[in-house]
Structures are given as C-alpha cells and as structure tokens.
Amino acid sequence: MPQAPSPTSTTAGNPRLLLWLVAIGFFMQTLDSTIVNTALPAMARSLGESPLRMQAVVVGYALTMAVVIPATGWLADRFGTQRIFLLAIALFTLGSAACAAAPSLTLLTAARVLQGVGGAMLLPVGRLVVLRAFPREQFLEAMSFVAIPGLVGPLIGPTLGGWLVEVASWHWIFLINLPVGLLGLLATLRHMPNLRHASPGRFDLGGYLLLAAAMVSISLSLDGLGGLGWARTLVVLLMVLGLAALAAYWLHALRSPAPLFAPALFTVASYRVGVLGNLFARIGSGAMPYLLPLLLQLALGFSPAQAGMMMLPVALASMGIKRPITHVINRLGYRPVLVGNTVLLGLMIAGFALMTPQQPLWLRIAQLALFGAVNSTQFTAMNAVTLKDLAPERAASGNSLFSMVQMLGMSLGVTCAAALLHAFSDWLGGTAPAQSLPVFRATFVAIGAMTAASAAIFWQLAPDGQGLAPHAPVVDDG
C-alpha cells in the first residue's frame, strides 16, 4: 500500500490515521456487500428457510444504501463529518450485532437494513473529509490510498465468508465487525475532524421521500414475485405506486428551485445514457455475486469454502484488467467498447448455464476469470463515460445520483435473479437442491439476455463516445 500523504489543514488527530480510518470504513462497507453471499445456504438451513428465498438479506443491505446515499452529503454538511461518521460506524456495528443474533429471516433482514444505513454513510462522508482535509494536489493520492482496502473487501469477502461458515458458523461473518467497529468509534473521536458547511442550504426532503418511495416500491414489487408469496394484486399495486412516485419526483424536480437531483443533469447525453445503461447493465452484473455461490453449492455440490475460493478468479481478473483496458477504451472509444462488451457480458452470463458437475476445474476457473475481466471492463467504461462530460457545478450532484443508481442496480439484480429462480422453480419443478441445475440454467440464460439487450442503450452514444451536448465541458472523473 502506498504511503499516506499528509494534509496541510488542521485535523482532530494524526492525518495518516485519518486516512486509515476512512480506508477501514470503506473496507467494512465493501466486505459486507460480498461476504454474505457464500453463507446464504448455511443461513437458510439455520433459519429454516429455502436457500432460494434468502435474497432479502442481500437486497435489504444494497437497497438501503441506495436510499440513504443521497442524504449523506447534506447530513455531513449540517451536523459535521465526525458526528455523522460516528453515527455511521455505530449503526453499522449495532446492525452487525443484530444480524448475528437474529433468530429469523425477517429480523435478519431488518438488521441488514440497519447495517445498510450505517454502511451507506461510511464512504461518502469519509471521501468528503479527505476532500476537505487534504489540498487538491494531494487528493488523488489520498483517495488512491483509501480505495485499496475497498478493492480488497470484495476480493476476500466470498472466501472469508465461506471459510467462517465451515470453521465456525454464519454468525461470525457479522461478529468480526464488532471489534473493528469499536476501534473505529474510538479512532473517529480522536482523529476525525468535525468539518461542517457554513450554510448547508435546505434539503429537498419532499423530493427525497418521493425518490425513496419509488425505489422501495419497485424493488418490493419485484421481490414479491421472487418467493415472498404476495398476491399478484399487491405486486401490481406496488409497481404502480413506485412508477407514480418516480413521475411525481420528476414533476417536483422540474418546479423546485433546488431539487435533490436536477433534471438538467440529463441534458448531458453521455450522462443520460451512462446512468440508464448502468442501471440495466448492472442488473446482470449485480445478480452474479448472488447467483454463482448458490449455483456452486446447491446445484454443483461445492462446500461454502470451495464456493468462496471459486470467486477468487473473478476478483483477481477484475483487478488485473483495469490498467490495460483504459488503453483499449482510449484507442477504440466508448461506444464500440460498451456495445461490444455489453453483448459479450450477456453471453458470458448465459454461458454459466453450461456448467456441469463434470466440468474440468481448469475450464471452470478460466470461465470465471474471463467473466471477471469482461465485467470489470464494463464497470470501467460505464463509470468513465457517465461522468466525463459533467460541468464542474453539476459534478457533485451527478456523482451522488450515479452512486445511488449503482447500488440500486445491484439491488434490482439480486431481486430479478430471485424472481426468476422462483418462477423457473415453479415451471421446472426444481425445488430440491439436487434438481436445481435446470432452474439455474434457465435463470442464467434469462439474466444474460437482459444484460445483452442493454447494449442498445449504449448505442445511443455518439460514434466517438463523446456526449452529444455541444457545450458540456469535460472534467476529470478521477
């Protein structure tokens, strides 16, 4: 890890420890987004549930983060970074303890929601502190230092989760957060500055509530199709309510002088295409960390630790491709890379339908590694094209909306995957783990087709990959 730079501004404690504190918060957030996936079958057995009904444990965390993220910047400006970071760690730690003690799926999901509220504030508030505590010329170096643990979290999460399930129990994937959280609280009191904005402005509470209602209602309606056993009338009602709330937010934003997210953001074509493409393409990508461990354990007979180890090729290839792929994007442009790679990503996802218990190990590893490289290419290109043409005065709001869409896409990916698993289980009769392989195959093909279809969105980019708005100045998204 590179040496942490030192800020010139006054902080509450050691500036290098401040960076470590923010980095560990980022690590905790990303670790808990992946560590539960390999433990879901063990959780299901312990709680007396079907492994195919455990999606709420993942969706509750990701959806809560999507809902809370838009409010974090204003909360930090209004109440101070130290107070909000303390609150974030406290809620995350309490949520972890509640998860470990949960005796039912309902209470476990509620605890994951509490954990998600804290997790949603860790990185945005930490990034805000680094931005204000370090001079501009040191910001990129400081954020690079902070980002490394965030990359390590998803890398070790599935493997650590599977190992803990085998050597102890699934409860320990949450209990390991407790000592880290307690140390984080003490470190925040000593080393986190309580930076506040002199005039944070008025928060668009009405717009925020409409947007939150839209996200939650649409997600719950899809979740109602995925094994919750809700009546079709309730599912349709929730979907209509969600779409109505989304339309109401748009009308509200058009009339409000200071909306949560201004509609003017979508006048920048590259941002509009990037956000829409991110949402739909990430449904496929977001489904995979949920589906793959279930496939390996339920249909192919892997142990939790073995399933976790099989996720390592995905993570390693994802990290290894990031540097060379930027040269490819610069050479070919955004549109050809995104259109071609989105189709390829859909084919890779559908290709997991070909997995069998007799498949050679080397071929399975190669398939997972290739998927990791293609998936990482998709993220790199989508992230860059979405933010590159935003004007400086819109960058903060645009980045916040983009972060929300990323988490929403992950949540919807798991929700859609669970709904498809449930539907294909009914149609194909594969409810028992030994009979579930055809169900997983059909689900992977459907998710792959949905992902490949989202390539049509990226086709709307200009041929050179630039935004179509003629006067939008280019800013460095790094």
Placement of each model-derived feature along the sequence:
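Intrinsic disorder in cytosolic terminal tails and internal cytosolic loops
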Residues: 1-14, 459-478
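Flexible interhelical linker loops that connect adjacent transmembrane helices
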Residues: 8-12, 137, 183-212, 254-269, ...
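12-transmembrane solute porter fold
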Residues: 15-31, 36-40, 47, 51-61, ...
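Hydrophobic/small/kink-forming positions within alpha-helical transmembrane segments
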Residues: 63-67, 97, 151, 155, ...
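Small-residue-rich packing faces within the transmembrane alpha-helices of Major Facilitator Superfamily
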Residues: 66, 86, 93-94, 117, ...
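Helix-loop-helix hairpins in multi-pass membrane proteins, especially solute transporters
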Residues: 69-206
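Alpha-helical transmembrane segments of multipass membrane proteins
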Residues: 97-98, 163, 216, 220, ...
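C-terminal membrane-cytosol helix-exit motif in multi-pass small-molecule transporters
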Residues: 178-196, 212-224, 241-255, 454-462
